[in-house]
Amino acid sequence: MPKMNVESFNLDHTKVVAPFVRLAGTVEGANGDVIKKYDIRFKQPNKEHMKMPGLHSLEHLMAENIRNHTDKVVDLSPMGCQTGFYVSLINHDDYEDVLNIIEATLKDVLAADEVPACNEVQCGWAASHSLEGAKEIAQDFLDKRDQWDKIFSE
């Protein structure tokens, strides 16, 4: 296959083993700032996916809560394939700390009693949420914490 512009299109999705957290890209700005993008893969590509209401609530919960654990977050976004998220951090290069930040954020999800910004003023599809679904996805990922640094099958 020809090399593509999008990093994830060059990843052989048949060779990865979810769940995992991998460095997906690094960009250096003109003034020396470095942004690292991480692939937080919750589900095995082309085998399973997160259902939208749970994924949507997980996005809200993670996007809000991750910023309580680091001030380096540029963005946290869901993947269109519904198998994971991307998180981008600026001037932060400690992979183990990234794993700890994600773990703490997902523990916040489990402790949540509501989905932040789950209303028509703050959300573009407020009817599509599931706190319970988000908690199930988070718990499943946390249960496999020891696998997060293993991206490919051996």
Swiss-Prot record:
Stored InterPro entries: LuxS_sf, Metalloenz_LuxS/M16, S-ribosylhomocysteinase
Enzyme class: lyase
Statement: the UniProt record of this protein carries the keyword S-adenosyl-L-methionine: no
Source superkingdom: Bacteria
Cofactor: Fe cation
UniProt KW RNA-binding keyword: no
Catalytic activity, EC: 4.4.1.21
GO biological process: quorum sensing
Assembly behavior: Homodimer.
Family: Belongs to the LuxS family.
NCBIfam families: PRK02260.1-4
Listed name of the protein: S-ribosylhomocysteine lyase
Organism for this UniProt entry: Staphylococcus carnosus (strain TM300)
Gene behind this protein: luxS
